[in-house]
């Protein structure tokens, strides 16, 4: 099914490429045309980008920006195909780390280092820790647009009603979950119909249970083995939470379980800080992923990563494309992002008392103050390894695989990836 979908995407993009080759990136009236591709065809991001483009075009009447957007999972396939054509988008969305690095190694992304160096008024206003995940071999290839990280959300009203405190350790998390379940609440909302939600737990648990040097080696496509016992222990920890998740985790998606949390049917959810606005009006509290006895990784590391945009190495208009990205990541547009969308700009000082709640500002500070960041797991490893991991864990959650069996499948995928990387 996935191969058929990819075939259809290739066919459709090929037809568009043929059509695109007959036109010019500069129109007859002298305007420069830029193609802008992102992953938010739905509100509120859809209107946000349309309004940003409209304002930019008003200030730059010689530039016309054509927007195209597809949803998350479709985007991952389509952008890879589009960048392989002779008419790729000039500006395109990208997750950071390995997802972006593949495009860089494939010469699909423009080196933006000179823009960072020559326009420090712009580059210095970015949160510096958010630039690094788009940096490859000491060169900058992407512009961070928004910051995001994981945290446990909890319903303060439910916790106060049952006289519960936010857990600081794993044992306390289990104890709190037991008490919530005894009082008729679903302790933790979790939906894995779309498997990306699994990667957030796995990324965090691997960081806690496996030492950093081993993880770095295993996450590298050329050297990954995944034989350390910490990976099995991480999955066993996830298994310990299974009695406290909602029923049928593999049959429901994240949006559904988030709504369950919002309606007060569940008391906790491991969510992205960018989702705070989506669970209003819950009396919301947050706590970091609890410390685990015997863990090898730091509790001060935060799971999360920036998302941003890159410019195609094939663009005929790098200057104009960069002008748009600098406009998109200006302080004014960053403040608009926080206010209109509820996401957090990678521009410093954009979450204020005027456009963000106290807990949103707390979330931003949490990211800025983090000692280190743990990238989204499925964006930090080879896609074959990620698929083996997420499919295996989904089966484990359904009772069809053990942690050991999951890791055997991951080790097999890693071996194949190593062979192809040689």
UniProtKB/Swiss-Prot annotation:
Subcellular location: Cell membrane
Signal peptide: 1-20
InterPro entries reported for this sequence: Bact_solute-bd_prot1 (IPR050490), SBP (IPR006059)
Broad class of where this protein is predominantly found: membrane
Assigned GO CC terms: plasma membrane
Highest taxon of the lineage: Bacteria
Lipid-carrying residues in chain (S-diacylglycerol cysteine): 21
Name assigned to this protein: Uncharacterized ABC transporter extracellular-binding protein YurO
Native source organism of the sequence: Bacillus subtilis (strain 168)
